[in-house]
């Protein structure tokens, strides 16, 4: 079974293997240039590396590629404020449960 990109990236980030994660995301962007997923994940990686400007660029690209992609919108909302919560949305399941439509869409 092949590991989903989101799961692989989350695992690599948790293990602080940022260079490997960046390499995998770069490959994914080349293979799927119109996919929002690698850009959202690259935004998370950039935030973890304290590169907020690049993170926001990738979140915006992910959102531009697919405005219905909830994790990108959630991450833009979380990290576009002065004091972010520190939570990331790798997938829709990572968005708050209480009211996904209000908080994540």
Q: What feature does the model see in each segment?
A:
Residues 2, 36-37, 70-71:
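Helix-start (N-cap) detector for alpha-helical repeat units in TPR-like alpha-solenoids
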């Amino acid at each position: 079974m092949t590991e989903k990109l989101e799961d692989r990236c989350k695992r690599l980030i948790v293990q602080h293997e940022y260079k490997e994660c960046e390499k995998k995301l770069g490959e994914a962007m080349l293979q799927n240039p119109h996919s929002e997923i690698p850009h959202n994940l690259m935004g998370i990686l950039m935030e973890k590396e304290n590169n907020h400007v690049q993170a926001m660029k990738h979140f915006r690209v992910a959102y531009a590629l697919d405005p219905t992609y909830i994790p990108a919108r959630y991450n833009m909302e979380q990290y576009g404020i002065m004091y972010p919560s520190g939570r990331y949305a790798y997938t829709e399941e990572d968005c708050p449960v209480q009211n996904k439509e209000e908080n994540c869409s």
